[in-house]
Amino acid sequence: MGGLRRRSLLAAAGGTAAAAGLTSTGPSPAQAVPRAAAAGATEAPVPSGRRPGPYDRKVDALLARMTLEEKLGQLQQLPWAYDTGPGGPGTKAVEEAARAGRLGSVLSIFGARTCNALQRIAVEESRLGIPLLFGLDVIHGFWTTFPIPLAQAASFDPQVAARDAEVSAREARSNGVHWTFAPMMDVTHEPRWGRIAEGNGEDPYLTAAFAAAKVRGYQGDRLSAGDRIAACAKHFVAYGGAEGGRDYNTVDVSESRLRNLYLPPFKAALDAGAATVMAAFNTIGGVPAHANPHTLTDLLRREWGFDGMVVSDWNGVQELIPHGVAEDGADAARLALNAGVDMEMTSTHLVTHGRRLLREGRISARRVDDAVARVLRLKFALGLFAHPYADEDGAIGAPSAKSRAAARAAASRSMVLLKNDRGVLPLARSVGSLAVVGPFGDSTDLLGTWVMPPAAEKFPAGTVLDAVRRAAPGSTVRHARGVAPQGDDTSGIPAAVAAAEACEVTVVVVGEPPALSGEAAARSDIGLPGAQRQLVEAVAGTGKPFVVVLVNGRPLTVADWVERAPAVLVAWHPGIEAGPALADVLFGAVNPGGKLPVSFPRSAGQIPVHYNHENTGRPYSPDDKYTSKYLDLPDGPQFPFGHGLSYTTFRTGAPELSTGRIAVGALREGDTVEVAATVTNTGSRPGDEVVQLYVHDRVASIAQPVRRLRGFRRVALAPGKSRTVRFRLAAADLGFWSNDPHGEFRLEPGAIDLYVGGSSAADQKATLTLT
């Protein structure tokens, strides 16, 4: 989503009042390798055979009354306000377009009164009275800011995402918003990419589970309900594969990787009912996603049967020109519409050039009607024709106690304990003295990327310092920032060291400011910014116990100091209840149970490093130089996918299978294999363990990842208690997509190793033979 949208909210604010995831989500076969869209190419045919829908008669009747200009207007989305950047006519022109019936949607608008004023123009002053569709980036909260999506994935509990979406939808819909541009489900192996904060990490299975949960949370059972909003599956597709982690960059991906890595979360989101899809900024094989009929039409429409609306990303149609595939705006409009884009965000090429393109035969009236029908069906589904206005008296203007409690629980459930040497954590509430140091110790800038500016201003995050003081009221709590979030000034470090030396234990709160993650926030160096590393080393030099709390929007490189830190807790950007949630974990009211949804690399030069890499012909060996490795780094990440400790300990037994052999034909007919594993709390505290199931196909027709996540379950156990966790493996979990141009799914005979445990390094193993 374009970075201009966040800035636009600042102007818009002035007018406002205020355990799923265990089933396979593999997509169906498709020809998804893109072919170049030649300048003279005809449109991608409109998919046929669509099932009749409940609003078809109403939509057809409305289409019959609409002029061409009104139809093209329904395909236009304009921003309500903005300050700089390309495109966008300003609020007066938006009102004029609504009055003329030449506008379908408005983004970056919220507030019941503001939305109603604009909606009245469309409904009461335009010829046909077609209501507007109001969209907003409700990514991880509206008023109640939850942890960033990457943090939520660390909970390994999709209900965390569902609860975020439910709260967000209720608050947003009451303020006039109908549609969110979320969830983002771009799998990535690139921690340098800033938008990793908006997604769910490096694994397609985990991402698919969270994508589906969030769609269900936003949309519920009925879009027309007064507390639900339409979801948008973005960015279609492979945006997370941007070269070098630089945003908007090129993606070059094989058919197999596209289908095995990038597509499963989208299929899961659509199976969960996602109403819309957003095209991606990147190219795939040289073809921009906004002009790619093979992903937007052949795969999305024909194979998967998606009948919803596809929206461009911010200025995505216009950007076909600098991509070098469109000569001008008319050509860009032609390419996008014919590829499968239904609504143009920000730029205005379809509404400007549509009549000429039709006259010249470069687009068809049928394709225009198809796109308009998708827009109108969504408006009917949302109930906008019957109830176009928000209830101004019922608009939610602040987080509730209940929503804050949900955000607090989500934040603590998402935190990951990387290490805890000598049992430094949890802290005793009776500790005599405690220091809080670091640039984020007293900071409210802990909400994360993509936060609505009025929410950040009115409802900032609770600070760690305040929460620690409340949690340990009898303790002497000292504070010193030491250093700023960015910059090389170390003059404050002596004060921080003095505070640490004077106290029994120190909490060092360091990390990234939210501005360093998110869109257009790629970093070549993903270590602690500025002088923060020097602060950690200085505190370590005191010899006193200390804990490092990381607040971050991506994995960080920590190799240069982590061995000196007795305990490290990853808090991510935790949202509105940051301080209280951190205090809950630091003092043991909550036992951390989160797991890493993405690997932490040893250095930026090691990227990409991820658990689900493929075999090579020369696997790593520490004793053989001529194997796949770096000469100056140990093999593997600093902390692997799925890693996370607890204040207690767990033991997971070997997996037990319902059968050790199963025929490929039986799997294709729907048979499954049950995998059971018993986990025991072997420590002295109650706690949560995430039991994870991985598979590896030993010999296949194309090289397979060394491990693939195929199940997870978060379980709570009292000390000494055990529980047997059961998973079911189906054909989709045991096969893979080949590089066949038609997207062939293969399920081949042979041995498949199964691993269960508490991380991707799980060593409890069994073998299943496919015959």
Q: Predicted regions span which residues?
A:
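Glycoside hydrolase catalytic-domain context in secreted enzymes
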Residues: G2, S24-S760
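N-terminal export signals
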Residues: G2, S8-P27
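Short beta-strand elements
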Residues: A762-T771
